[in-house]
Amino acid sequence: MPEAEKLATVSIEDVQARQDSRRIPINKVGIKDIRHPVRVGGRDGQEQHTVANFSMYVNLPQHFKGTHMSRFVQILEGHDTEITVQSFREMLHEVAERLEAESGHIEMAFPLFVRKTAPVTGVQSLMDYQVAFIGEIHEGEPELAIRVVVPVTSLCPCSKEISRYGAHNQRSHVTVTAKTRDLLWVEDLIDLVEEEASCELYGLLKRPDEKYVTERAYENPKFVEDLVRDVAIRLNDEDRVLAYNVTAENFESIHNHSAFAEIEHDKTGEPRR
């Protein structure tokens, strides 16, 4: 009999299952930053192949020495189908059940590509957005949040007001983390943010498009404070969002530092609008 088969027939002690005498529970234990290919479902009904970074954790009671690390990878290997918000919830349940835990946490971070059309010439190009699905489950009750980083253009109202011509503008990152009630597409959040910026970004622009976006930003100046407030208003009006955190970081073109603003709001218990 081959040596591997001999080992398979021998009962090997499960060290992780030993009792631990220190009697200190662990809030989160698991695997961090494991890369795995996934297929993500989109609003247009198409799926997109990408590579995601997964971090997967469970709680560990005080009487157990360790958790079963290999089971996290087994769960990932079992999800080779398209990942949607619904299947992500199912993965949360599976983690808690397979690891026999009261609570679990999964974060799946990945780049999402969206095909955009230039505003004047109609030329198409891809834009990438950093997205994360963040899930928590406790005693069988899952909660899901979506985080997306949306690059936009911001133009300074003060610079426009005091200058004889021109105004300083820069690329900004608006990050929205939204706890959701019902199905909310990542693309819905991207659209919401881009509509509130001085101007949205594109992967490819021709000269007529560049003229348009330059003038669009000039006609729509916003401080970093304006940006987070306007996005917050839109999120307040979105019934599918239960709670949110929105930040804006302007990579200032006339300073060697960024401008930053943040709003956090929990809508739980508020009547639907």
Curated annotation (Swiss-Prot):
GO BP terms, alphabetized: tetrahydrofolate biosynthetic process
Annotated EC: 3.5.4.16
Disulfide bonds: none
Ranges in coiled-coil conformation: none
Gene Ontology molecular function: any one: GTP cyclohydrolase I activity
Catalytic activity, as annotated: GTP + H2O = 7,8-dihydroneopterin 3'-triphosphate + formate + H(+)
Site features described as May be catalytically important, chain residue numbers: 156
Pfam family membership, one: GCHY-1
Main EC class the enzyme belongs to: hydrolase
The keyword Hydrolase appears for this protein: yes
Iron keyword on record: no
Keywords: Hydrolase
Family the entry assigns: Belongs to the GTP cyclohydrolase IV family.
Database matches in HAMAP family: GTP_cyclohydrol_B (MF_01527_B)
Role this protein plays: Converts GTP to 7,8-dihydroneopterin triphosphate.
Name listed for the protein in its UniProt record: GTP cyclohydrolase FolE2
Source organism: Alkalilimnicola ehrlichii (strain ATCC BAA-1101 / DSM 17681 / MLHE-1)
